[in-house]
Amino acid sequence: MEPSTNKPDCKKIFDSIASKYDRTNTILSLGMHHFWNRSLIQILGSGYSLLDLCAGTGKVAKRYIAAHPQASVTLVDFSSAMLDIAKQHLPQGSCSFIHSDINQLPLENHSYPLAAMAYGLRNLSDPHKALQEISRVLMPSGKLGILELTPPKKTHPTYSAHKLYLRAVVPWIGKSVSKDPDAYSYLSKSIQQLPKDHDLEDLFSKSGFYIAKKKKLFLGAATIWLLEKQ
């Protein structure tokens, strides 16, 4: 994944759909994103502190605190509108919020044992730089859990149906529920344009990580990678 020079203004997109984001996601994923988020938390394991990147409205953070009540979570997102929603339903004592781009995290070196990024990889303007920055703030042997929506391979039986769903159904639901068809048209395209597995594996390696675990979910519609800092 090379730095993108023609990626739309993702911050503007997510600010515009923030108020309807959770409801629309539930409809689009048929509620499966709740299971996917839970799987990410299970794969990450326990830790006293979690860095939640592309944190959005805080659903991953909320689930992590429920599973690990003694832990603290730092939520980072470039959309202030998304973080404002997260602040409304997360315990302030356990959570802190940072409005920032991942490419330049205002955090000390080696300061977190665990990090999570759900549905954010395909929206990064410079994935290599972002992953290097995450590696910088992770402790030695720190872990990063990435959850992303992924297109099935062309040889997979669900490929045609999945492609039709992304091209036709996702923008239509986005228009009906969020009233912002352009935003969900972009989100649909970003899933279809996600690099192939071997390209992602190469990206992770060049950014200072190795894949400790990989899990496909719901016929390959989503994938979790557990990366460990080299």
From Swiss-Prot:
| Enzyme superclass (EC) | transferase
Q: Does the keyword Membrane apply?
A: no
Q: Which family does it belong to?
A: Belongs to the class I-like SAM-binding methyltransferase superfamily. MenG/UbiE family.
**Any single GO BP term:** menaquinone biosynthetic process
Q: Which GO terms describe its molecular function?
A: demethylmenaquinone methyltransferase activity
Protein known as: Demethylmenaquinone methyltransferase
Q: Which residues bind S-adenosyl-L-methionine?
A: T57, D77, D101, I102
Gene source species: Chlamydia pneumoniae (Chlamydophila pneumoniae)
Cite the Gene3D superfamilies for this sequence. Vaccinia Virus protein VP39 (3.40.50.150)
